[in-house]
Amino acid sequence: MEYIYASLLLHSAGKEITEDAVKAVLSAAGVEVEDARVKALVAALEGVDIEEAIEKAAMPVAAAAAPAAAPAEEPKEEKKEEKKEEDTTAAAAAGLGALFG
């Protein structure tokens, strides 16, 4: 993630995203730089409109946040699921006991 953050920092500062620039940002942050990862990142970002990518990534988050109101029945459903999980765990434990006699 640090490599992507470094490229985003360079982009927001209006700097060109080059191998040397990414290495400099990572080194300044105290990150041990791997040349292969830097080269792969710079190559992957060639021709990518970072602003457009950020906008596309932010859109689903905003859309997903809209349905915040939840019905009051959801906690009851969760309790049923928890009971099923407990039953499954108990059955698994019983099965393991049969293995060891």
From Swiss-Prot:
It comes from Methanothermococcus thermolithotrophicus (Methanococcus thermolithotrophicus). InterPro entries: P1/P2_N_sf, Ribosomal_P1/P2, Ribosomal_P1_arc. PANTHER family: 60S ACIDIC RIBOSOMAL PROTEIN P1 (PTHR45696), LARGE RIBOSOMAL SUBUNIT PROTEIN P1 (PTHR45696:SF10). GO terms for cellular component: ribonucleoprotein complex; ribosome. Residues 65-89 are annotated as: Disordered. Residues 73-87 have a biased composition (Basic and acidic residues). One of its GO terms (molecular function) is structural constituent of ribosome. Forms part of the ribosomal stalk, playing a central role in the interaction of the ribosome with GTP-bound translation factors. This is Large ribosomal subunit protein P1. Part of the 50S ribosomal subunit. Homodimer, it forms part of the ribosomal stalk which helps the ribosome interact with GTP-bound translation factors. Forms a heptameric uL10/P0(P1)2(P1)2(P1)2 complex, where uL10/P0 forms an elongated spine to which the P1 dimers bind in a sequential fashion. The keyword Membrane does not apply. The keyword Amino-acid biosynthesis does not apply. NCBIfam families: ribo_P1_arch. Belongs to the eukaryotic ribosomal protein P1/P2 family. GO terms for biological process: translational elongation. Keywords: Ribonucleoprotein, Ribosomal protein.
